[in-house]
């Protein structure tokens, strides 16, 4: 029997161990997509206890706790922090096979030096030891980031945000670069009830009137210029349902006017407006050399009762299953026809789309850019061991694993950076298996460089 999560965790061959310990383990982290709060980084917040740092905004954990039957008061409610923690400890003890189990114990080991498995029986001992350390200066938010050798992290930000935290951090002596990401979902999703109110906010932020779809593009262009001044290198879009129908500017303007006048839009009209906005934004991204991330197929807020009670992003989303390959191909080609396709990263929440996305990415290339269109890492419901292995196998079978930009946390927790370690161990194990099965030569120096590139260097080259 192998020891529980020891130094060779998930590394099944000698080659895998060599690649991880001599290459992947030492590389810094470029976390190009997360949902961390930049205000907490600026303030260098000291987390009060494990409950605050673990359960403050993590819907992965909330879903698992609900599956255990705990009351909402112990999950997102006003219950005592220690009682919430005990409920989480019991949840983790029962979470065999779930990535939360491995993530939680990697966090305990890497940040706190705690190797005792979390359970209700061990909860008090772990609570006391971890909380004592959380009160020291070594465990402020900035030090948690530096502890994991994070060189860059990209937060997720709305075009109307003033980015005061990012701008202030630029003036401070903080070794990690905290960069904004441009996420204009609220400008794109005109079917949302608050779209008219958002148009007013965007107009105020951009300092210009918005009376048409073309005006929306101009306003977003103004805000993108501001984001670029704060170091933005990447955008992000959540695409749900029909997101592209070719149309003229006049047709997109008509759809915008209809929506602002209270009209009910057809699916085709939604696709026309969204496609017009997205292709124009894509051309702007290409002009400014920033990457475009497309996160596709989240089916959000399925429990309307809980959405009314708690709002969005609280653990009631799941995978969608609509077909979108022709639409995606036409959308990307629209920009490529003018040689205006930006670097693009494709993700689907439904793993059934993996072969399609990997093959789609190979349709669009450019001299001097390694894998200009990337098949993105296993996302959300897929960022577990099996999901990562599947994504790596699909990418290597259809595309080029060696040019892959690697992992991200997609997290709201400052303890989540060991997820990069989890990915790197799985990556090294996959490559190690190929080598020791005689499927690839044991050229360890070459392979170590490849692992270093996938772990960090490729992302630096791609985004910076």
Residue ranges and their predicted role:
Residues 331-337:
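Short, basic/hydrophobic alpha-helical segments
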Residues 324-328:
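Divalent-cation-assisted or electrostatically stabilized phosphate/pyrophosphate-binding catalytic cores
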Residues 298, 303:
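Hard-cation-handling environments
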Residues 1-288, 340-342, 346-358, 362-464:
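Metal-cofactor-binding active-site regions of metalloenzymes
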Residues 266-267, 316-322:
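A short acidic, glycine-rich active-site loop
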Residues 292-294:
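C-terminal amphipathic alpha-helical interaction region
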Residues 307-315:
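Short glycine/proline- and charge-enriched loop/turn segments
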């Amino acid at each position: 029997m192998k020891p529980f999560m020891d130094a060779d965790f998930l590394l099944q061959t000698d080659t895998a161990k060599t690649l991880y310990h001599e290459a992947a383990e030492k590389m810094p982290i470029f976390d190009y997509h997360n949902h961390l709060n930049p205000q907490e980084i600026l303030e260098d917040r000291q987390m009060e206890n494990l409950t605050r740092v673990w359960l403050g905004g993590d819907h992965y954990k909330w879903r698992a706790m609900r599956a255990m039957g705990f009351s909402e008061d112990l999950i997102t409610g006003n219950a005592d922090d220690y009682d919430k923690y005990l409920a989480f400890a019991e949840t983790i003890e029962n979470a065999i096979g779930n990535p939360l189990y491995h993530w939680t114990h990697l966090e305990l080991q890497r940040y706190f030096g705690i190797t005792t498995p979390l359970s209700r029986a061990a909860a008090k001992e772990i609570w006391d030891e971890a909380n004592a350390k959380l009160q020291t200066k070594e465990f402020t938010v900035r030090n948690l980031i530096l502890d994991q050798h994070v060189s860059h992290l990209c937060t997720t930000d709305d075009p109307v945000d003033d980015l005061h935290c990012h701008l202030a951090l630029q003036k401070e002596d903080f070794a990690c670069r905290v960069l904004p990401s441009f996420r204009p979902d609220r400008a794109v999703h005109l079917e949302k009830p608050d779209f008219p109110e958002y148009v007013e906010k965007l107009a105020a932020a951009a300092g210009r009137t918005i009376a048409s779809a073309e005006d929306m593009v101009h306003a977003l262009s103004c805000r993108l210029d501001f984001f670029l001044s704060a170091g933005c290198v990447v955008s992000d879009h959540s695409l749900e349902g029909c997101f592209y129908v070719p149309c003229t500017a006049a047709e997109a303007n008509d759809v915008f006017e209809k929506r602002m006048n209270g009209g009910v839009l057809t699916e085709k009209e939604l696709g026309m407006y969204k496609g017009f906005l997205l292709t124009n934004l894509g051309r702007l991204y290409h002009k400014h050399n920033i990457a475009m991330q497309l996160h596709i197929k989240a089916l959000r807020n399925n429990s309307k009762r809980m959405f009314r009670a708690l709002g969005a992003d609280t653990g009631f989303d799941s995978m969608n299953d609509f077909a979108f390959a022709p639409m995606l191909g036409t959308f990307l080609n629209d920009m490529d026809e003018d040689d205006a396709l930006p670097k693009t990263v494709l993700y689907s929440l439904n793993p059934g789309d993996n072969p399609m996305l990997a093959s789609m990415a190979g349709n669009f290339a450019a001299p001097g850019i390694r894998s200009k269109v990337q098949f993105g890492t296993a996302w959300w419901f897929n960022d577990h061991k099996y999901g990562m292995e599947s994504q790596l196998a699909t990418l290597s079978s259809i595309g080029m694993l060696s040019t892959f930009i690697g992992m991200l946390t997609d997290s709201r927790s400052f303890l989540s950076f060991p997820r990069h370690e989890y990915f790197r161990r799985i990556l090294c194990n996959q490559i190690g298996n190929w080598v020791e099965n005689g499927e690839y030569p044991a050229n360890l120096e070459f392979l170590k460089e490849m692992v270093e590139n996938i772990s960090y260097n490729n992302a630096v080259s791609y985004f910076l």
